[in-house]
Amino acid sequence: MIPFTKNDLASLFTPQVLDRGRQLLSAGKVLSREVVGDGMIGSVAGSHGEQYAQTLELRRSKNGRLLIGDDCSCYVGSRCKHVAALLLNHL
């Protein structure tokens, strides 16, 4: 797994999405997380108990910026609070 920091996450998500991700993490909504190569698969419960599946892959650009390819089964689909919670859980 490519190492990343809170600053990296701040470059990927809006402050609101990161805040909602922190709330999900604090509430124990990250149900599973598995590192697979340079990415993760996981499951995060939504605000109302729904269960959403996430897959993501991280890499660094030539200038060192963190890049993400992600997918979530929620209606947002990517760069959502569920993906943020999964990444925050890894820090």
Question: Predicted segments — roles?
Answer:
Residues M1-L91:
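Long, low-complexity, compositionally biased intrinsically disordered regions
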